[in-house]
Structure formats: C-alpha cells, structure tokens
Amino acid sequence: MAKYQTNKTKRAVYNTLRCIGVMLFGQNRFKQPKFLENAAQKDKYEVWLGMIDEGKINEVENELIEETEQRRPDMHPSESEKMAMLEVALQIYKYINDKDDAFLERSSYSREEVEEGILSVMHILHIDTDMICRLLV
C-alpha cells in the first residue's frame, strides 16, 4: 500500500476514534481509561499493551472481543460497564493504530482491521455504528 494511502487510513482511524470519544465520553482526547480502577483490570490492560508491542495483535483482539462479549446487553451489564469496555477497546485500537506500517505488516495486521475492530466492538455492545459512520463520511 502506498505511503500516502496508509497515512490517510491512519488519520481516518484516528478521526473515527476521536469522533466516538467526543460523542460518547465528551472528551476530545484519549486519556488513561477510567476502567483502570483495580489492579486486575490495570494488569490485563498492561498485558495487552505488552502483547501488542510483541506483535501479538490478533491474540489481543481475540481476548478483547471475548471480554466485550461478556458485556453484551443481553448479559445485562450496567451502562457504566458497557461504556468502560468500549473505552478500553478504543484505547487498545488507538494504541494499535499508533504503530508504524512496518510493525503492523510484521504483525499481520492492517489499519483497516483496526477500523473493523472498532465497529465490531460497538456492534457487540449494541452501539449505533450507522450514526458514527454517517458522521465520518
């Protein structure tokens, strides 16, 4: 993929993340997730970041999707649990998106997969992805 195209995709993913953050959390920047309230949660998040740094992006994504599935609306999570999970997912995908193209290629991952992952998490949590997609067009 041409460098221009990958930079354009990287910006598009970042804009998706920013837009979702503003709409759902009222913040324009991503900060340390509020979900890091206890040591176990913080440890899991830090393990995921370490795995990403090792190139194990697909493994992290699988675990993230599994965690998200446990907070599906039919599992009756609280609204704050659902939003905390979304915030975690957005942070993870932002971290992945911040990696350079060569790293992503070595890790068998693409920026398109970042965007697909964001939309998948939102779909699992029953958050209206159509509204987000319309805003980004």
Which residue stretches match the model-derived regions?
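Non-catalytic amphipathic alpha-helical adaptor/oligomerization segments
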Residues: A2-V137
